[in-house]
Amino acid sequence: KEFRLSEEEAVELYSNAPLHQLMSAALRRRNAMHGPEKVTYLIDRNINYTNVCTINCQFCSFYRPPGHDETYTQTFEQISQRIKELEEIEGVRILMQGGVNPDLPFEWYENLLRELRIQHPTIALDCFSPIEIEGIAEVSKLSTLEVLIRLKEAGMHGLPGGGAEMLVEDVRKDVSPKKGAPANWLRVMEEAQSLGLTTSATNVIGFGETL
């Protein structure tokens, strides 16, 4: 019998089911949906449009603070060229993330998305993690929901899931105290989902996390 798991059932499986049993069940479900001979994948590309950031995560060697001589922000043309290279190998999606850059006005993000949507109409644009959305909202003095609405109107397809390691408050306080509270990350994702934007969750591991 096919049915969706309830929230309680999902939590129970996550908390108590042996991993090998979950893996086996997932394989059986995939085979039932697509057949055992079919495996799907897509080709995408990560684009880091800026390394300017004010969050200063302890584990990040990528960011540079504003004013540092190694900072960069890519031009629209540079970003478009990276997408052209993706299209040449039949890629279908970008995941574009960067730092929380206080020097970029909200219009920069809107104009970038509009330009990319015109230049690359078939590419899914998954852009700006919840942490970046919070930063954009702060600079623009808009709510995160208003930011998401306008970015969707400009052509954004979904959000990458960066920053999910911060959902554990003790971890956040230890390695990235300037990031927003876990509730903020969840709120942005819930707002995105309410607008029909795709979302995911990705996290850096190795901070002593447990199930």
Predicted regions: what is each one?
Residues 4, 38-40, 46-52, 58, ...:
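Residue-level preference for alpha-helix termini and adjacent loops
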Residues 14, 45, 163:
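Small/polar loops that bind or transfer phosphate-bearing groups
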Residues 23-66, 71-97:
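N-terminal pre-triad scaffold of radical SAM enzymes
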Residues 1-20, 24, 28, 81, ...:
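Auxiliary Fe-S-binding modules of radical SAM enzymes
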Residues 64-211:
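Conserved Radical SAM active-site core
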Residues 18, 52-54, 58, 176, ...:
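Short capping/connector residues at structural and topological boundaries
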